[in-house]
UniProtKB/Swiss-Prot annotation:
This is Type III pantothenate kinase. Catalyzes the phosphorylation of pantothenate (Pan), the first step in CoA biosynthesis. Its main location: cytoplasm. The active site is at D109. The gene is coaX. GO terms for biological process: coenzyme A biosynthetic process. ATP binds at D6, I7, G8, N9, T10, N11, I12, V13, T132. K(+) binds at D129. Pathway: Cofactor biosynthesis; coenzyme A biosynthesis; CoA from (R)-pantothenate: step 1/5. InterPro entries: ATPase_NBD (IPR043129), Type_III_PanK (IPR004619).
Length: 256
């Protein structure tokens, strides 16, 4: 079994890949002060919850945008599983070409998302990841990662709204029944939802316009992707496991 570890700014998500199936996924909060022993305990407990033992793990692949946490988690894997994990990063084989100004600066999570989208759904494809930050990345029909957009995630934008104002409360980010808010809470929910969705749609249209009307697929992922998947015709597929599919593909290209 392959364990895929996605270390993000907000959460660490573990995927247990048993053959072509994802046998289980687990999420914990990203904390820089967790020790390698704490991460090791999380990992072994999640394995047991899915019916596995540490000895069932054949290998591990890590995708991280938080270097300090990646170091601790990597140490936990070496200690608890006796495995030196593969790490998604510069020099790793993906089968795609990265043609941006500084290829080494492309986030490991974006690279894995693109691999998952391109090899699962084909190109050309626009990959939108609704995480702590919101990213859009274009992959050509030849598998070339050539352009993208990075902007504020909806949670970060929402936190600024109630964090920087005296009388606006924290609200759940969800699809409202109507844009016609009638109290502070519903006005905020409508504003957050529809302005973010509108920005997503405009971004997709702008990509299409500047790419000469290219008929790319739009694949979304990330924790909040599900909220928007059925409210716009511009999104083709929401795939919550996209990064794990990409990591599995990358692993298969690099394993000895």
């Amino acid at each position: 079994m392959l364990v895929a570890v996605d270390i993000g700014n907000t959460n660490i998500v573990l995927g247990f890949l048993d053959g072509d199936a994802i046998a289980g996924t687990y999420r914990i909060t990203t904390k820089a002060n967790h020790t390698s022993d704490e991460y090791g305990l999380f990992l072994t407990e999640f394995l047991r919850m899915s019916g596995f033992q540490p000895s069932d793990v054949d290998d591990v692949i890590i995708c991280s945008v938080v270097p300090k946490v990646m170091h601790s988690f990597r140490s936990s894997i070496v200690k608890f599983l006796d495995i030196d994990p593969m790490v998604v990063g510069p020099g790793i084989k993906t089968g795609m070409n990265v043609r941006v100004d500084d290829p080494k600066s492309l986030g490991a999570d974006i690279l894995a998302d693109c691999a998952g989208a391109y090899y699962e759904y084909g190109g050309p494809v626009l990959v939108a990841d609704f995480g702590t930050a919101t990213t859009f990345t274009h992959v050509s029909d030849k598998g070339v990662v050539d352009s993208g957009v990075i902007t504020t995630g909806i949670r970060a934008g929402a936190a600024a709204l109630w964090g920087d104002t005296a009388q606006l409360p924290e609200v759940e980010i969800t699809r409202p029944d109507t844009i016609l808010g009638t109290n502070t809470k519903t006005c905020m929910q409508a504003g957050l939802y529809y302005t973010f969705l509108g920005g997503v749609e405009r971004t997709i249209r702008q990509f299409r316009r500047e790419l000469g009307g290219e008929d790319f697929k739009v694949i979304t992922t990330g924790g909040l992707g599900r909220v928007f998947e059925n409210d716009t015709e511009l999104i083709d597929v929401y795939d919550p496991d996209l990064i794990f599919k990409g990591m599995a593909h990358i692993y298969s290209r690099n394993v000895k």
